[in-house]
Amino acid sequence: MASALWTVLPSRMSLRSLKWSLLLLSLLSFFVMWYLSLPHYNVIERVNWMYFYEYEPIYRQDFHFTLREHSNCSHQNPFLVILVTSHPSDVKARQAIRVTWGEKKSWWGYEVLTFFLLGQEAEKEDKMLALSLEDEHLLYGDIIRQDFLDTYNNLTLKTIMAFRWVTEFCPNAKYVMKTDTDVFINTGNLVKYLLNLNHSEKFFTGYPLIDNYSYRGFYQKTHISYQEYPFKVFPPYCSGLGYIMSRDLVPRIYEMMGHVKPIKFEDVYVGICLNLLKVNIHIPEDTNLFFLYRIHLDVCQLRRVIAAHGFSSKEIITFWQVMLRNTTCHY
């Protein structure tokens, strides 16, 4: 009886193993066939930025500003304008910035203005949301909005809108910064940094990314197709967490954008425009001014940075409140 049982068990186990083997082989065959069916492209090693350039400004965007009371600072001379990308429904994130690093409008007599960049949430947007955004803008006067869809893949359109708005409606700003709602900005340090610059023209800085490879894998957020970007390496560019530029570059970059087809990544797109304009990125001597990845910064470290990425709205409020206290830092 026992020997018969032992004879049956191995045969069942063998059958189970065979089933799993066949399943794995089927999956492997499927992926091989899928991969072979994909169009294959030769990655271009040597980058030619003129590949992206059109002599006529055929890529000039004609989206419309949609708010009735349009944001305008053409009659002001702000030292710094900070433009923050935001989603229409993310009121909490905007409010967190308004009561923390974006609240103070003057630092040592230098005017700093903060505005939020929005698109349209859906093709047929909810009327209540549209009205609430109008009310929010009437209350704070800090929203810039156009009628393109507000999606991750349209972030480049949002950046083009930012450059257009500064060029047309806020041309006197001495410096301009573009950042995101999940970034903690130490506004005081930013103003000090700009005041200590030796030059104020052809200046562009942030968290530099040099020889960054284009990603062709499965993760859609960071994937870019060969058709959209055929080169192996991206141009030198500054991460979208926060880049800063002098006034003279804004209209030049905006004009160049009309000649360069938008790509998925807005910061890379700006980098392409900079390379075509032959503008070099200024790399800060202090490598701890910009933090790209979320790290466990304490309050004393935040007192020394300009921008740190990866903060929730609640964390921005908490860290700002703690940073304002008279905590002694010994390092």
Curated annotation (Swiss-Prot):
GO terms for biological process: glycosphingolipid biosynthetic process; oligosaccharide biosynthetic process; protein O-linked glycosylation. Glycans are attached at residues 72, 154, 198, 212, 326. It is found in: Golgi apparatus membrane. GO terms for molecular function: galactosylgalactosylglucosylceramide beta-D-acetylgalactosaminyltransferase activity; N-acetyl-beta-D-glucosaminide beta-(1,3)-galactosyltransferase activity. The chain crosses the membrane at residues 21-43. Higher expression in heart and brain, and to a lesser extent in lung, placenta, kidney and testis. Lower expression in liver, spleen and stomach. No expression in skeletal muscle. Its EC number is 2.4.1.79. Its main location: Golgi. GO terms for cellular component: Golgi membrane. Residues 44-331 are lumenal. The keyword Transcription regulation does not apply. Pathway: Protein modification; protein glycosylation. Signal peptide: none annotated. It is a single-pass type II membrane protein. Belongs to the glycosyltransferase 31 family. Transfers N-acetylgalactosamine onto globotriaosylceramide. Plays a critical role in preimplantation stage embryonic development. This is UDP-GalNAc:beta-1,3-N-acetylgalactosaminyltransferase 1. The lineage of its organism: Eukaryota, Metazoa, Chordata, Craniata, Vertebrata.
